[in-house]
Amino acid sequence: KLQGLSYAEIAARGGGILNSADRLHETSEEDLFEQTMRRAEEIWQKGTGCVEIKSGYGLTTEDELKILRVAQRVKAHSPLRIVTTFLGAHAVGRAYKGRQSEYVDLVINEMMPRVAAEGLADFVDVFCDEGFFTPEETDRILEAGEKYGMKGKIHADELAFSGGSRVAIAHGALSADHLE
């Protein structure tokens, strides 16, 4: 992305969200914690006082929980102020290719209740854009998040006008990123 490539070009070269999810799946929770603590210490030393840690690179229930559990551990061991965001709807996990509505149900009915039960996230975020999640799916996910006490955020309209900005407004989202 920093080299000006589109998401499609990055994916064609073997990168992107799904590639990152594969790599995260292979990383133990302890290794992820150690890596994240090193980064937290580095940014603290450079003057950062507050940081948001998002999930969204797990795309399975266990891997999304792993990311957020690590975030909570870092929060407990770092002087940084850390806020956490559940972004299970960053992309459709590989196991659900061609079954997007089932993946949305997984996010709402399995992932989100577990995230809430463990108190792992302050916010819920959705990538509402062409090729990712529709405004209707985004609406369902944000509504579910509200029921669990997670204020909504949204990534939208980066690749095309998706209508995500309207969903953000309808839900009083805390932030709406991209909107290009």
Give each language-model segment a name.
Residues M150-G152, E158-E180:
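Active-site-adjacent C-terminal substructures of enzyme catalytic domains
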Residues A8, G14-W44, G49-S162:
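Metal-coordinating catalytic core of metallo-dependent amide/deamination hydrolases
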